[in-house]
Amino acid sequence: MEAQSPMSTLFIFVIFGLIFYFMIYRPQAKRNKEHKKLMSELAKGTEVLTAGGVIGKITKVTEGSDSIVIALNDTTEITINRNYIVSVLPKGSLKSL
């Protein structure tokens, strides 16, 4: 049995490192960056979808806090953590439901 050279072993580790970087780390970092951008753009009047499937309109955003208030209809409001917002909906989405 022939022993592998140290360079070929190092080459294999470098290949696995590159695969890990481009297949796992980089896409996740990109998603995190997009989510942070989404969180910074939240404002009063924005229609959002939460992780629990709740759709509502933001009525209050507190900058110092992680919580926001969402109006589900004219009489019901809930307070949630801003990290549970999954996506921003187009204007008028609530009226079309």
From Swiss-Prot:
GO terms for cellular component: plasma membrane. GO terms for biological process: protein transport. The keyword Cell inner membrane applies. Its main location: membrane. Signal peptide: none annotated. It is found in: Cell inner membrane. Belongs to the YajC family. Part of the SecDF-YidC-YajC translocase complex. The SecDF-YidC-YajC translocase forms a supercomplex with SecYEG, called the holo-translocon (HTL). This is Sec translocon accessory complex subunit YajC. It comes from Haemophilus influenzae (strain ATCC 51907 / DSM 11121 / KW20 / Rd).
